[in-house]
Structure formats: C-alpha cells, structure tokens
C-alpha cells in the first residue's frame, strides 16, 4: 500500500499480511478507494453538536434533561468555570471533515436547557461550538436515534492481504472492539498472544488503587512551586505521566515559555513528542482546551511561536 502525506507530499510504501480498516466515517472510502474492494455493509453518519457556555449554576452537579422530542441533553461542568451542553442527533450526508454545528442546532440546545433552568441562556453566551460525526452501522432504520450504536466486522479474504472492515463503534467500547477484532484475525496470526487489556490502565492511569485524590495530593507535594490550577490541569489530563510533561523542571521558569493561563512550553513539547501533535490547532483545540482560557491575542501569539519553533520533524 502506498501512502502520501497530505502536508509534505512524502510517499511511503507499506507491506502487511493484513489490513484493519478502522477509519470510522471514512471506512467505505478506504474500502473503495484504497483497498479497491467492495462490501455490502455501510455506515450512516449522524452529527452530534455541542456548545460551551459560562457555567450558570453553583456546585459541581451535572444535569441530564429530556427535550420535547424525547432526546436527552447533558449539561456538565467543564473546564472549571464553563459548561458543556450536548448533543444533537442529526443525519449527516456531507464530508466528515467539514462537519460543524449550525445555528439551528445551537438554538435547539439553548431552547432545551432554557425549558429547565430559571437563568436563561442567550445566543451570545455561547463561547464555542463543535461537532462530530458518529459512524453508525447502517441497519436500515430511519430514525438516527434508533440506529444501533454497536459495531459490525466484515472480513474480506478474497483479494491479497485480508481486509478487516469495522463498521460503527464508539470511544467508550474501543478496547472491547479491538479485542474482538483481533479474535477475528487469530487464524491469520496463529502466534498471536492472549487478551491483556482487562486490567491494564490507560496511558497515565497507573494510579495506585485508582485513588485520584491521594494521587493529586502527592502531585501537590511533589511540585510545591506549581500553582494548584496547573497541578490540577496536569493531573487530570496526563495523570501519572505528569512527570514526563514537567521533565525535571524545578520551578515555573523551568517549564519554558508561558503562553497564558496554565499553558507552558513544556506541555507543548510533550504533546509533540508523545501525542502526535502536528499543529498549533492540534494543541489548542484537540489535545487540550487551552483555547478557552487564552485571549485572542494570546492564541495568536502561540500560533506564531509554534509555527516558527520547528518542533515537528
């Protein structure tokens, strides 16, 4: 298989005994355009949009309310002083990479929340919106909310290397999906080992007894020079890998350039080195939510710095 880097134009050739097509919303594109194969199965895209607003209640409670159309809407505390509200559930037929929340969806979420709370949200309260597409296995049902959230495998062994196509799936069950997918490939890789993820923590989750509060106290003791908000940010986002982010720093100056809020150069370098961040947008919007805590000028200054720092090989 030959690949081309869309940023650099670099091409590479890969050879494999099997291909697992877990491209999500692009799964059928890979089947037809990359593997030059066919499948009777398909996915349908369902758009889910969210809005972020200033937190408008006291306390740490989260809420789940039912709208007039029977859909449930969550209202969660988010990033300290903000609230995350979602989601919509709308059939989507555009390009997955172009998905965005539209005004109708934003109004839908605001109206749903305002049915339950005394303090009414307004359009100008929306700080940010984002949207994603769920690649749901197309089981022929008309209502997007009724489409199965389960996943389906399709193993094609008719061509060269076997092609395992994954239709559907979601982030909360990705480990189970991966495990069962490997079971389907056992006859292709007879030396394959057994299952191992049942009690294996996620990266950064190597916390004794899963006791986060004790872990957080230890972090504060380990880095007494660090502001509590920064300790909280690192602890929640990176867990036991906080030490890799801090990288031996003994004071705030040791974390490198400060971009505003709890955003320091050491975190940027970690994300590029360990979490495949390639662009300033990757860091501000995807790996972190720093964009919510920086001014427009601070965001622009970071983008300019990153673009000239030559951190990405």
Regions found by a protein language model. Name each.
Residues 1-6:
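Short beta-strand segments that buttress and anchor functional surface loops
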Residues 8-18:
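Core beta-strand elements of the Rossmann-like FAD/NAD(P) dinucleotide-binding domain
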Residues 23-24:
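Glycine-rich, N-terminal phosphate-binding loop of Rossmann-like dinucleotide-binding domains
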Residues 29, 34-85, 90-296, 301-312:
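C-terminal catalytic lobe of FAD-dependent flavoproteins
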């Amino acid at each position: 298989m030959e690949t081309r880097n869309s940023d650099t134009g670099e091409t590479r050739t890969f050879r494999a005994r099997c291909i697992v097509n877990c491209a999500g919303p692009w799964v059928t594109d890979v089947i037809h355009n990359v593997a030059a194969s066919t499948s009777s199965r398909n996915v349908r895209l369902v758009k889910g949009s969210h809005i972020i607003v200033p937190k408008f209640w006291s306390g740490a409670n989260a809420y789940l309310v039912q709208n007039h159309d029977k859909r449930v809407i969550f209202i969660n505390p988010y990033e300290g002083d903000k609230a995350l509200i979602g989601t919509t559930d709308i059939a989507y037929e555009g390009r997955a990479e172009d998905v965005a929340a539209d005004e109708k969806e934003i109004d839908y979420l605001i109206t749903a929340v305002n049915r339950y709370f005394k303090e009414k949200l307004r359009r100008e309260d929306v700080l940010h919106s984002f949207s994603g597409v769920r690649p749901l296995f197309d089981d022929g049902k008309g209502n997007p909310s009724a489409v199965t959230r389960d996943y389906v495998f399709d193993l094609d062994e008719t061509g060269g290397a076997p092609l395992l196509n994954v239709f559907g799936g979601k982030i909360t069950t990705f480990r189970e999906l991966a495990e069962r997918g490997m079971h389907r490939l056992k006859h292709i890789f007879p030396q394959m080992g057994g299952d191992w993820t049942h009690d294996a923590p996620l990266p950064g989750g190597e916390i004794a007894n899963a006791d986060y509060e004790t872990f957080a106290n230890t972090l504060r003791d380990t880095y007494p020079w660090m502001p509590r908000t920064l300790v909280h940010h690192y602890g929640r986002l990176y867990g036991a890998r906080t030490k890799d982010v801090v990288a031996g720093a003994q004071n705030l100056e040791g974390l490198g350039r400060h971009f505003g809020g709890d955003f320091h150069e050491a975190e940027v370098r970690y994300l590029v080195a360990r979490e495949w961040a390639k662009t300033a947008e990757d860091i501000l919007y995807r790996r972190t939510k720093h964009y919510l805590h920086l001014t427009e000028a601070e965001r622009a200054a970071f983008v300019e710095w990153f673009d000239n720092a030559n951190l990405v090989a």
